[in-house]
């Protein structure tokens, strides 16, 4: 799940806050970041499209595929300055996140009105992401200083998510999904401001941060809409 990968890019944001960049360099950095983010969205969608027909196989191989996904993310950290290879690893990772989302998508499609549920979740995610991005640009509040409380909140959510993997409590699932939506909505603001300040080391760092924000919000909303929108007994 993207939730467990979210630390990747944030670690670089405050490590490079003091990097001196001119206004023109920051503008170029922002443009490149959002181009990569858009391309990542397409690659993730391609992974999901390929994965849905073989959702059962992906579910059965969840652990090795998850380890591969994490391995690609870690590997990206070491090759992000190597042209060509960095993009290949980045898109491989993003494609894998789409594959890993396929079982949830397939399960939702199997519900009554499943296609509508997925469409609504994506539309709501886009609205939330766009609104938070706009707010990040317009607000005078500096969310980049909230690294520590956001990290603590993330660890708490991850901890409860792991616990609920064993408990399988539906009510706790709802609470966790709601918390994920709220937390990653704030992280959209946090990451957007870091990108606008040129705080990330590379555009790939910023693009992956935004992509994981979007992915986690979408996944959480899809789970919530699936729970409340499933009328099958």
Predicted regions: what they are:
Residues 1-233:
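A hydrophobic alpha-helical transmembrane-helix feature that marks the membrane cores
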């Amino acid at each position: 799940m993207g939730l467990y990968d979210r630390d990747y890019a944030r670690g670089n944001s405050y490590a490079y806050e003091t990097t001196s960049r001119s206004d023109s360099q920051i503008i170029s950095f922002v443009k490149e970041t959002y181009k990569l983010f858009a391309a990542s969205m397409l690659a993730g969608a391609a992974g999901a499209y390929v994965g849905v027909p073989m959702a059962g196989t992906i579910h059965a191989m969840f652990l090795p595929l998850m380890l591969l996904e994490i391995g690609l993310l870690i590997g990206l950290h070491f090759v992000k300055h190597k042209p060509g290879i960095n993009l290949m690893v980045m898109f491989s990772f993003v494609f894998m996140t789409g594959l890993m989302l396929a079982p949830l998508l397939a399960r939702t499609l199997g519900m009554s009105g499943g296609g509508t549920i997925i469409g609504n979740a994506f539309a709501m995610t886009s609205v939330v992401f766009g609104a938070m991005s706009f707010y990040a640009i317009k607000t005078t509040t500096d969310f980049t200083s909230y690294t520590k409380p956001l990290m603590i909140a993330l660890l708490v959510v991850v901890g409860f998510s792991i616990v609920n993997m064993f408990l399988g409590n539906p009510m706790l699932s709802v609470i966790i999904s709601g918390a994920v939506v709220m937390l990653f909505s704030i992280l959209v603001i946090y990451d957007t401001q870091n990108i606008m300040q040129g705080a990330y080391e590379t555009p790939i760092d910023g693009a992956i941060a935004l992509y994981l924000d979007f992915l986690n919000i979408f996944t959480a909303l899809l789970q919530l809409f699936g729970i409340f929108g499933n009328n099958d007994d």
